Amino acid sequence: MSRIEALPTHIKAQVLAEALPWLKQLHGKVVVVKYGGNAMTDDTLRRAFAADMAFLRNCGIHPVVVHGGGPQITAMLRRLGIEGDFKGGFRVTTPEVLDVARMVLFGQVGRELVNLINAHGPYAVGITGEDAQLFTAVRRSVTVDGVATDIGLVGDVDQVNTAAMLDLVAAGRIPVVSTLAPDADGVVHNINADTAAAAVAEALGAEKLLMLTDIDGLYTRWPDRDSLVSEIDTGTLAQLLPTLESGMVPKVEACLRAVIGGVPSAHIIDGRVTHCVLVELFTDAGTGTKVVRG
């Protein structure tokens, strides 16, 4: 008997009742989920995430998944004897690294997630920014120690073809987006999944952006465990940004972009927790850190 089956019936009923207002609020809305971290590498978490996406779809909510693949890309680079480097929280992407990223993101990570979701029904469709000109890229640099630094074939999302994405959503599909996109000259760039998720959420007018991480939420004074915040506004978060660990910077920038761009809230949640998406969306307490306009 599973732990859920062992719960008293009245507790199960309370859980369902608590979820009802949130189900009503989100019905018919787009929720963009950035899928990454341990949730991508632990088999139990991967299957739970796929089940969560199918659950949302069957409740009349429209999930759009934007996934990374950092650990898998790093592993493949090592297998091939290619050295990788990071600057300012972003992977330096040479043409050789880009070839590996394309192979891993769309051919491995995206395929695996599509198959897991489709075990629950014919819902998921794997796509990249190259498909139907879903989105285009513009090359970016990063600032490291106050200096603009080139990081190779790494882009920001320039434009999102919302019609192509919404056609899939209207057909009852769950887009699973690998973050590769061409620039105006057709040169393909690797786009940080956090950055891409924010751009997609903003363009689609999503109700929420969820960022799966390997941490409980946002700590204002890491590693002080007492500094975890449950809610923070964009003004305060922007002031905090220069003090954060480099790995958290792209996630926080994504939340700021999405919320300032019109998404009502962005959420940094712990992807190490089974069914973390359902916990965040359908319980009063939620989990992690909620970012709101302010």
From Swiss-Prot:
Report the catalytic activity: N-acetyl-L-glutamate + ATP = N-acetyl-L-glutamyl 5-phosphate + ADP
Biological process per Gene Ontology, one example term: arginine biosynthetic process via ornithine
Q: Tell me, what does this protein do in biology? A: Catalyzes the ATP-dependent phosphorylation of N-acetyl-L-glutamate.
Positions bound to substrate: 69-70, 91, 190
Localization per record: Cytoplasm
- Entries under NCBIfam families matching the protein: argB
Q: Which organism is it from?
A: Mycobacterium tuberculosis (strain ATCC 25618 / H37Rv)
Query: What does the record give under GO molecular function?
Result: acetylglutamate kinase activity; ATP binding
What is this enzyme's EC?
A: 2.7.2.8
Q: Which family does it belong to?
A: Belongs to the acetylglutamate kinase family. ArgB subfamily.
Instruction: Please give the name of this protein.
Output: Acetylglutamate kinase
Keywords in UniProt for this one? Answer: Amino-acid biosynthesis, Arginine biosynthesis, ATP-binding, Cytoplasm, Kinase, Nucleotide-binding, Transferase
List cellular component terms (GO): cytoplasm; peptidoglycan-based cell wall; plasma membrane
